[in-house]
A protein has these predicted regions:
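C-terminal segment of classical bacterial N-terminal signal peptides
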Residues: 1-8
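N-terminal activation segment of mature serine protease catalytic domains
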Residues: 9-49, 56-59, 99-101, 238-243
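Short, well-ordered loop/turn sites that connect or cap secondary structure elements
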Residues: 50-51, 122, 199
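Catalytic-histidine neighborhood of serine endopeptidases
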Residues: 51-97
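Beta-strand/loop subdomains of soluble extracytoplasmic proteins
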Residues: 73-76, 81-90, 124-129, 143-164
Length: 243
């Protein structure tokens, strides 16, 4: 039984290098651009192109900041094309706070779009991958890929030790629960908005949106828990249908 799983995993992973060639051109760094600021570009998270290639899906919390419109601050995406770093301005079209999703529209050129898969068919134990910018653009625009199994399909509200840790957002999640994918992979704050995809087909089955943090927020980088979460892609499909 163990041998058969290893053979299956190895067979699936042999196609990952080819799939990555299709995935990486669609993955962008999401941030803001302000001409009078130093630095002018500030990284917020990851996103990826969908539909016609001019629409970018990311997390609602990634684009949750208020823009300094008086000084012409705008959302922007950053990516590498033909080995050159590129930037495009983007407009925030819609936000789904309940499922932590947001949709941006590019101002100019379109990017290769990723296909949204059927997340209702995802099973625990299946192997997937996600690609994004875990520590931002510090090392340049080079998206990083991690593999992960679906460790569990569980409610979106993370358990708390005592009632003092409860907040309004957590209570809202308890009122309108839905399932998310729990992963056995280490994701970092910059991975928010990264596509979680099938390593055989490249179809997106989820979007990374949070990590389980032990202690303070700084521990997300210095002492990661190795537990991450992704929103199923069925909610992305609904967002796109209503755009």
């Amino acid at each position: 039984m163990l041998l058969s799983y290893r053979v299956f995993a190895q067979a699936a992973e042999t196609g990952l290098p080819d799939i990555l060639q299709r995935i990486k051109p669609s993955v962008v760094a999401v941030g803001t651009y302000l001409p009078t600021r130093n630095p002018r570009a500030v990284f917020l998270g990851t996103g990826f192109a969908v539909n016609d290639g001019r629409h970018i899906v990311t997390n609602a919390h990634v684009v949750g900041k208020d823009l300094d419109s008086d000084h012409m601050e705008r959302f922007a995406v950053f990516y590498r094309e033909n080995d050159k770093e590129q930037m495009q301005m983007a407009e925030l079209l819609t936000v789904d706070q309940q499922h932590d999703l947001a949709l941006l529209r590019l101002a100019e050129a379109k990017l290769p779009a990723l296909e949204i898969g059927d997340s209702t068919r995802v099973r625990e134990g299946a192997l997937y991958a996600f690609t994004g910018y875990p520590i931002g653009m510090v090392l340049g625009l080079y998206p990083v890929t991690h593999r992960s199994i679906i460790a569990a399909i569980s409610p979106n509200a993370i358990p708390v030790v005592n009632s003092r840790q409860l907040n309004i957002n957590m209570l809202k999640k308890l009122e309108t629960p839905y399932n998310v994918f729990q992963l056995d992979a280490t994701a970092y704050p910059g991975n928010s908005g990264s596509p979680l995809y099938d390593i055989e087909t490249g179809k997106v089955i989820g979007i990374i949106n949070k990590v389980f943090v032990q202690g303070s927020k700084e521990n997300a980088i210095s002492n990661p828990s190795g537990i991450s979460y992704a929103i199923p892609a069925e909610h992305i499909s609904r967002l796109l249908a209503g755009k």
